[in-house]
Structure formats: C-alpha cells, structure tokens
Regions:
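Soluble small-group transferase modules, centered on the S-adenosyl donor enzyme superfamily
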Residues: 5-23, 28-36, 40, 109-245
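The AdoMet/dcAdoMet-binding core of the Class I SAM-like
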Residues: 1-98, 102-106, 110, 117-119
Length: 245
C-alpha cells in the first residue's frame, strides 16, 4: 500500500508517467530485479535513486557490475540516470561514484543543482551512444500542449519563470528547458583530470562503503562542485540547434 502512495507522488511531480496501465509495482530488491530480467527486457529510461552512499548496502547499487546490468537493459538511445548527494561527503567519495559510473558510460554527463543552494545534489546521465540534444526540437516539444503539465512541473521547482508570474508572462514558459540544460556541469571526456586516482567501486571491493560517511556533518558540496566546474567545457557537440539558441 505504501508503494502505491509513492506512485501517487510520482504522478504529481511527473504527470502522465503513471496513468492507466503504464505502471506496475514490483516488490523486489532493485538489483535482484534488474539482474534476473530476461535479456530482451529493455527500457527507455532506468533511473537509480539509491539512499545516501554512507548507508549500509548502498555501495552495491553503485558498482561497475550494477551499472553494466542497467546498461544491458537499455533500449537503443535509452538513458540511465543516477542521483548523487554532494552534501555530507568529500571529493574522494564523489570521485569514486562518478568515475565508476563513467567506466560503464564513457559518454556520461554531470548535471548539478544550483537552484536552491549551490552543489547540493547532482545527477549523472549515461547513454551507450553519444548524446545529442537538439535544442530546437526540445523547445518545440516542451512548449507544446502535450507537455504543458511537465513544463509546469519544471517551473514549480525553479526552472524558468517564477511560478507566480506565469499568468502574465506566458512567453517565459520557454525558459524552462534552457534553465534545465544550464545545470550541465561536465562530461566524462573532459573530467579525466578531475577523476585521476579515483577509487573504482566494484562488487569485489565495495570501496564506496569505506569512503562514504567519513565527512558526515561537513559542508563541502560547493567545494566539490567547483572542483568539477574547473574542467567545464561547453559541449557544442552535445547541444545543437539554431544560432538563436
């Protein structure tokens, strides 16, 4: 019953994702589920939102082997996303998480969160194929009526125009996708220097469970993000579109 309440929450924040028969609740350990799936069971998106890395058991959801399982169940063009907290952590811990993810997704990217405090969280995105985001197509889609509720959700959490100004500034709807993509912080190819000497987390060593938790109560999230941003290069081969974009 509690899981269905979670689904209700997803529907509120991500409209159209859980309507009708599109959602089935599976009662299983996430890693066990993905490992025992038939090889031909593929997904457009696999999102991994494990608990904080210092919690017992979380290291097993951040290993090379686990990411490979997820990668092998992506459809062509499919995406895997991973949430990572930068708070209560240190550089070595975050290096381990990111470098491990990039071992499996060498085209991976980092998106930061600077809406409500710099560097508090980050999201990793990975595709098997090189990622290309057409800004013109994205703008057209996100400003269409079919995506109106999704666009509104983005704006409610700070991407685009102030929610209070929506009624009298409808032209600001288009800012949502720009604000979202502006959180791009880096990619694997540009971050090799930052990841130097990172400890790769594997099933055989679970290094993350020994690294995480050593910086509880500290506030190094801004320092960590600034370190990543030193290697920032604008990804003109990822973000494409007309000159006006």
């Amino acid at each position: 019953k509690q899981n269905y309440h979670i689904v209700d929450g997803i529907d509120k924040e991500n409209p159209h994702m859980v309507e009708g028969k599109e959602v089935s609740v599976v009662y299983d350990d996430g890693r066990h589920y993905i490992r025992t799936l038939p090889k031909d069971r593929k997904f457009d998106i696999i999102t991994s939102d494990p608990i904080d890395p210092w919690v017992k058991g979380c290291a097993a959801l951040n290993t090379v082997e686990y990411y490979r399982m997820c990668r092998d169940h992506l459809k062509p063009g499919g995406v895997m996303s991973l949430w990572i907290p930068l708070y209560d952590s240190d550089i070595e811990t975050i290096k381990s998480v990111i470098a491990t993810f990039f071992q499996v997704f060498p085209n991976g990217m980092v998106f930061s969160n600077e809406i409500n405090g710099k560097g508090f969280d980050a999201v990793l995105l990975g595709q098997v194929e090189p990622t290309v985001i057409d800004l013109d197509k994205l703008h057209e889609k996100i400003n269409s009526q079919d995506y109106a509720r999704g666009r509104e959700s983005l704006m409610e959490v700070g991407y685009g125009a102030d929610i209070a100004n929506i009624a009298w500034r409808p032209n600001m709807w288009g800012d949502a996708e720009v604000a979202l993509l502006a959180t791009y912080a880096g990619r694997a190819a540009d971050m090799t220097g930052w990841m130097k000497n990172a400890q790769i987390n594997r099933d055989s060593n679970l290094r993350l469970q020994y690294l995480a938790g050593m910086s509880m109560g500290t506030h190094k999230e801004t320092e960590i993000l600034n370190g990543i941003l030193k290697y920032y290069r604008f990804p003109d081969d990822i973000f494409i579109g007309s000159s006006g974009r």
